[in-house]
Amino acid sequence: MTGAEAARQLLNSQGIYDVQIRQVAGSLTDHYDPRTKTVNLSESVYGSTSVAAIGVAAHECGHAMQDASEYVPLRLRGSMVPVVNIGAQLSWPMILIGVLSGGMGSPIVSLGILLFSLSVLFQLVTLPVEFNASARAVRLLDSTGILRGEEVGYTKQVLGAAALTYVAAAAGSILQLLRLIILFGGRRDD
């Protein structure tokens, strides 16, 4: 069974028939798009029969299941995207402009730090979304019999390792935010 076939079977098992499964170019490009209701699988996952590929496909289906059940953290994360994108683009330029024009304690620097904190919040909201999608994937792969025994355990390890990348990214962002607050927070150059 390929990643795409496993994805279709998992979605069907949950009564989700309105989600399309598509192959997308590149590697590590697997994602679920709630706007278009598509599970997008990279070339290396879509046609592969490896346990890892099936696990990745199942994880993306986990997001489709979250969408279908109106999982609150997924909705919250989706609603944050436009604001976070703007904040991510403007935070560092604001900090730099603030430092160059008004010094370390400039209100522009503070605004830049606030905008950066939106990205940190987004990453924190992402954690339960990713862990839940993986848990759903493992549970369904086991209950549907798509994977068995050691294969389920291996998939749990692969998805767990992938989830840790989100934890590491969030931790790095938190440390960067703390660094910005320590460097620039509350300072006045008057």
PLM region spans:
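Helix-coil boundary and interhelical linker segments in multi-pass alpha-helical membrane proteins
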Residues: 100-110, 186-190
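Polar-ligand-bearing catalytic/cofactor-coordination segments
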Residues: 1-87, 121-190
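Membrane-interface starts of transmembrane alpha-helices
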Residues: 80, 107-114
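Alpha-helical transmembrane segments of multi-pass membrane proteins
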Residues: 98, 115-126
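Post-HExxH zinc-binding segment in Zn-dependent metallohydrolases
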Residues: 81-105
